[in-house]
Amino acid sequence: MNKEFLLEAQKWAKEELDICINFWLKNGLDKENGGVYTCLDREGKIYSTDKSVWMQGRCGWIFAYLCHVYGVKEEWLAASKSCLDFMEKYCINRECGDRMYFTVTADGKPLRQRRYCYSEAFYCIANAEYYGITGEKEHLDFGIRDHNVEILCPFLNTACVDVRSRE
């Protein structure tokens, strides 16, 4: 491969990344409740206001990671914080060993809880990345707490899982 091809490929990748990130910033952010809407069509129209909890964590992580890689942009940092705050406030089932829900309503009411740990994993890495950017110790603490929950996942009482969530 020649240098010109690699430079063009790099330019194309950056353009695609910008399109994707701007799509989510423009259409996905929930300015009323926090977090992001996760059910959008290709035009950015919301077709369900239910929110995937693991996607809240994934967006919280990716926006903080973008700050780590490309430099801090306030809108990226704010988007990450919005997702993390939404998760901390609404997405942790305090009555089930701090396990996270899988799906919640737009305003954070629980809809479904699963037995696997995707929500916890993304919340953990999102807090770690956010802490790395901001130095805000509470996010380090949240990440450690969540990591400990995630490590114990196979041993947690699964009786807390709503049977209807397996439908």
Model-derived features with residue positions:
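Glycan-recognition and catalytic cores of secretory/periplasmic carbohydrate-active enzymes
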Residues: 1-167
